[in-house]
A protein has these predicted regions:
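Cyclic-dinucleotide signaling modules
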Residues: 1-7
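Active-site core of bacterial EAL-family cyclic-dinucleotide phosphodiesterase domains
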Residues: 13-76
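Flexible, charged surface loops at secondary-structure boundaries
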Residues: 32, 79, 103-105
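N-terminal accessory/assembly segment that mediates macromolecular interactions
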Residues: 76-77, 85
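Conserved nucleotide-sugar donor-binding catalytic segment
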Residues: 82
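Catalytic core of bacterial c-di-GMP phosphodiesterases, primarily the EAL and HD-GYP domains
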Residues: 85-115
Length: 115
């Protein structure tokens, strides 16, 4: 399924309406309450086999003016537990879409942080 179709599906399923995934080149990005969200991937290396076995996703968040916001500070903006769950699902979806989009460059498994 093309990235744009997946994004449309997830945006339709977002009943809260305060978040939006969107295509950005060959990857996905998201807006959530004034923050622009994107994914960074760090390789996970098996030292015995001397090869990359996967990637760990990290959230990159910026305010509208471009000021970086740490991931913990981004989560701290959530007012309650339900908002944390929604934001966490948005971030994991964003990371999964971006990992799929780069699968021809990076294989292995995807490690996701969960809050």
């Amino acid at each position: 399924m093309p990235l744009t179709d997946l994004i449309r599906y997830f945006n339709t399923a977002d009943s809260a309406g305060d978040s939006m995934l969107y295509p950005e080149g060959e990857r996905a990005a998201a807006w959530h309450r004034g923050l622009r969200l994107s994914s960074l991937f760090q390789p996970i290396v098996d030292l015995r086999q001397e090869r990359i076995v996967g990637h760990r996703a990290t959230l990159a968040a910026r305010r509208e003016d471009g000021t970086p916001v740490g991931s913990e500070a981004a989560y701290a903006l959530c007012e309650n537990a339900e908002a944390v769950v929604h934001f966490d699902r948005l971030c994991r979806t964003l990371h999964a879409l971006n990992f799929l989009a780069q699968r021809r460059y990076a294989g292995g498994y995807l490690q996701l942080p969960i809050h």
